């Protein structure tokens, strides 16, 4: 254990108070020559760390799993999951929770090492991670944070000095991931599958205390827990859809109880608007396509409700009815939040009957003309309609007149409407070709400057700054669709 606490470590281990079936205590596997390649200064400060101390060899050794800070209690979490619809017992196959950092404001965050070596849940995996996917998770999770979308975050990336073997030999790395917690829908499925009502209750009680203390007292606390998770996920999925984010692997083990986005493996942001957009190389049926995400979230939440049935009510029929009633509320909550978000994207303060139609007409035209999702709303926000097939079409010009007259009918000024649009339409997103460009420079050439410049731009997605304009350019047309892989 490293005892130098000038770095600011302040660890607790509340997860280890759960029954032992929920985890396995195991130390990380040391690596040969760790090197810090990325540290998140602002996140470090918010967690109560001293960033300069974290750059020292003693702390780099912690990020690499070669040492443990005082108070660490490394463990791999057990969970289950429906992966593309098929149920499996799973667990952290290459990640370890080393503890929960208590911040100066009293908040609690999991500190997890990802790529820290094999665990009892590794199956045939080596427990390691490659540098490219770890940097990719860093870039996209930080972009999501800047977009004000709940997400796990990345504190540090270290290279291990050792190769990782996938299809080819790749440089190894470990990511330090930060999350409100790593409790998933799959964690509840795991408890339910094991058949211990006591364990299921322990997990639910722990989750309420940690994430939803305001529902500690009511009689129907487990129903209230389900309600809160449904609300959080409805809000999260609406936010994904509004910025064109496609997660790619919405298995139940990747749906957090806290409502944070987790697992940035095959995710990507949509370029031209298409409800059927899929990037993941393994999602051959389009199960997790952009337009399917709200439905898949409801499906995943139904699996949570199923897992909770033994503790929702002592009468199984009544418990089933409660579960069905609560799940049925997801679609209405999601639709309302998405619609409200779309109105903001178009500068609409008030309500008019034809607002739904106005939004749907625009989206249909965007799909028909393969218009870039982000740049269409960016152009509307700037009120500069460049020569594109969409903007040149007679049907868009007709729609534009309807939209402008709609803006004129509301009490708020057009100036206020455009300001609201600016705050809800990101000027830039982590476009796939720019992310790949940054990863190629870092992994192949050891040049992190491209990534740093990209991260700097992505940190202010609503700034509409002139020096960001190069990141607004869409990728060159190609016959080869962009594909993502589950490297994270």
Curated annotation (Swiss-Prot):
Keywords from the UniProt entry: ATP-binding, Magnesium, Manganese, Metal-binding, Nucleotide-binding, Nucleotidyltransferase, Transferase
Identification of the protein by name: Protein nucleotidyltransferase YdiU
Keyword match Cytoplasm: no
Keyword match RNA-binding: no
The organism of origin for this protein: Bacillus cereus (strain ATCC 10987 / NRS 248)
Pfam families, alphabetized: SelO (PF02696)
Family per record: Belongs to the SELO family.
Cofactor entry: Mg(2+); Mn(2+)
Swiss-Prot/TrEMBL catalytic activity: L-seryl-[protein] + ATP = 3-O-(5'-adenylyl)-L-seryl-[protein] + diphosphate; L-threonyl-[protein] + ATP = 3-O-(5'-adenylyl)-L-threonyl-[protein] + diphosphate; L-tyrosyl-[protein] + ATP = O-(5'-adenylyl)-L-tyrosyl-[protein] + diphosphate; L-histidyl-[protein] + UTP = N(tele)-(5'-uridylyl)-L-histidyl-[protein] + diphosphate
